[in-house]
Design a protein with these regions (language model features):
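Membrane-interface helix-loop junctions and terminal tails of multi-pass membrane proteins
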Residues: 1-231
Length: 231
C-alpha cells in the first residue's frame, strides 16, 4: 500500500505544479516542472521506484522491473492523483478562462510524433539510470529524469503541450488545458513510447533481463540501494 501512496503523492505534486504553472503562464514552467519531478523522484525512489507516470510504469513492466499487479495499482494511483491535483490547481488559481489546446488535422500527427519521441526519451532514460545493474547506488538519477522532462517541455511544449505523461494529460483535461477529444493522442503516445523504451532496453542490455536479476529488482529499482524506475 505504501508504494501506491508514494506514487499518488509524487504524481499529485507533479500535476498540481504543471497545472498552476501553465494556467498562470509562467515563463519558467519547464523549470518548475522539471524541478518538482526531480525532488519527488529523490523523495520516493526508495519506496515505489517513483514512476509518477503510466508510460514509465509500462516501460518498467515491459522491462520486467515491476509485476503486472503492481503496475495496475500504480496506474490507478497516478490517475487518481492527476484528477485530484487538477481540482486543487483549479481551486488555487481560480481561472476565469483557460486556453484549451485542441488538436486537429495535421497537428494531430505532429503532436503524436512529438509526444511519442519524448515519452520514449523519458522512459528510456529512466530505465537506464534507475533500473540498470550497471548503475547501482547512483546519485544522479533524479537530475537525469527531471532534466529530460525539462528539455522536452522546452522543445515541444508549444507543439503538443509537452505532456509525456497520461496522468498529466488527464489532469490537464480536467483543468481545461487539453480538449477531451485530444486525450487519445497522449494515451497512444504513452503506449508507443513506453513499450518501445522497455523493448529497446532489453535489446541493448541482454545480460540485464528479469530472470538474471535478484528478487529485489521486482520493485522497479536497482538491486542494492533503491533508485526509481521513475517520471
Amino acid at each position: 500500500m505504501r508504494k501506491f501512496l508514494a506514487e499518488f503523492v509524487g504524481t499529485f505534486f507533479l500535476v498540481v505544479t504543471v497545472g498552476i504553472a501553465v494556467v498562470k503562464m509562467s515563463a519558467l514552467a519547464p523549470l518548475a516542472i522539471g524541478g518538482v519531478l526531480t525532488v519527488m523522484v529523490y523523495a520516493a525512489g526508495h519506496i515505489s521506484g517513483a514512476h509518477f507516470n503510466p508510460a514509465v510504469t509500462l516501460a518498467a513492466l515491459v522491462r520486467g522491473a515491476i509485476s503486472p499487479v503492481d503496475a495496475a495499482g500504480y496506474v490507478v494511483a497516478q490517475a487518481a492523483a492527476g484528477v485530484l491535483a487538477a481540482v486543487a490547481a483549479g481551486w488555487i488559481t481560480h481561472p476565469a478562462a483557460v486556453s484549451t489546446l485542441t488538436l486537429s488535422g495535421r497537428a494531430i500527427g505532429v503532436a503524436l510524433l512529438a509526444e511519442s519521441l519524448f515519452t520514449f526519451a523519458l522512459a528510456y532514460v529512466v530505465l537506464n539510470v534507475a533500473t540498470s545493474r550497471d548503475h547501482p547506488n547512483n546519485s544522479f538519477y533524479g537530475l537525469a529524469i527531471g532534466g529530460t522532462v525539462m528539455a522536452g517541455a522546452v522543445t515541444v511544449g508549444g507543439i503538443s503541450g509537452g505532456v509525456f505523461n497520461p496522468a498529466v494529460a488527464l489532469g490537464g483535461a480536467v483543468l481545461g488545458l487539453f480538449a477531451w477529444s485530444s486525450i487519445w493522442v497522449y494515451l497512444v503516445a504513452a503506449l508507443i513510447g513506453g513499450s518501445a523504451a522497455g523493448a529497446l532496453f532489453l535489446a541493448l542490455n541482454p545480460g540485464d533481463r528479469p530472470n538474471q536479476r535478484s528478487e529485489a529488482t521486482q520493485q522497479g529499482v536497482t538491486s542494492n540501494d533503491p533508485a526509481p524506475a521513475h517520471p
